[in-house]
Amino acid sequence: MLDRLQYVKQRFDEISDLIIQPDVISDQKRYKSLNQEYKGIKALVEKREEYIIVLANIDEANEIIADGSDAEMVEMAKMQLDEAKDRLPELEEEIKFMLIPKDPEDAKNVMVEIRAGTGGDEASIFAGDLFRMYTKYCETMGWRTSVVDMNEGTSGGFKEVIFEVTGEDVYGTLKFEAGVHRVQRVPQTETQGRVHTSAATVMVLPEAEEFDVQVDMNDVRVDFFCSSGPGGQSVNTTKSAVRLTHIPTGLVAQCQDEKSQHKNKDKALMVLRSRLYEMELAKKQEEDAKKRSSQVSSGDRSAKIRTYNYAQGRVTDHRVGLTLYDLGNIMNGDIQKIVSELQLVNNMEKLKEASEVY
């Protein structure tokens, strides 16, 4: 393991030198990539230092015990040895997880799209509940959220809502939320008290930079229209809303959240770029998932991933068989237990795949 960590230390020193070079700073793509790598391995370099200290403590304690000339020093050395031997396997496990190659997309900001599925008005209300859940979670993580586009439901919630999330390691945290979310509850409009099942689809798109995806504007049809509010009524008389259609793929992105037509066009282009990037990413994830029979990252955006059962106060994630009877807090944004479990399973899969390294 020390050999592998030595390589990490060499790479860290190399990057530390590179990111202060003027030619690197002037190359936006390279600088950003190196900066992300620097942040990613800094914690690992610190763990390496701790690992070296623990190994040195074991050697030192063994020497003192073997010498045996000072009884008091021997007792202290035995305590030091026990402490170091307890810490060593923990530290090795932590380092193994940190050595797992990170997806380069994990550090990216995201576009989250929530669409009401089967279930009519109730599905729209549920889409609104999911939107609230995610924005609350983002708040606790210190991330910023910004609505890009929305289409409100007739009885509340959203037929569709798209919002941007910016912060640290956003995609790496939220990527496993993509898929079909199902709710089982008695709708507000239900007079007979019957439980209905509705669904909403969540898409999590890593935000693509201009250098990730080149969009030829000759392939894009641009339409301008008036922004609309609830029920479709026009909320302004200027055509500030923008719809972009990517002709080769048929993908459509629009934005009407900003008052400025120029800003709406920029945001719509950002969504379009992210959707094109995600298409390629989904293919790659599907191939990777087949290789390692992944539980949590199938690349299948139509897979039912989670059920929210209100009568039982239960949330079940079907991919990892996790059931929590804490629906109230979860719907209020406390989804960290679910996120952590999904990340753990994904890391265990990667660790198994890369086990020959260790």
Swiss-Prot record:
Q: Name one GO cellular component term.
A: cytoplasm
Q: Where in the cell is it found?
A: Cytoplasm
Q: How is it modified after translation?
A: Methylated by PrmC. Methylation increases the termination efficiency of RF1.
Record's keyword terms, sorted: Cytoplasm, Methylation, Protein biosynthesis
Q: For the modification N5-methylglutamine, which residues carry it?
A: Q233
Q: Does the keyword Protein biosynthesis apply?
A: yes
Coiled-coil boundaries: none
GO MF terms on file?
Answer: translation release factor activity, codon specific
| Family per similarity comment | Belongs to the prokaryotic/mitochondrial release factor family.
Q: What is this protein called?
A: Peptide chain release factor 1
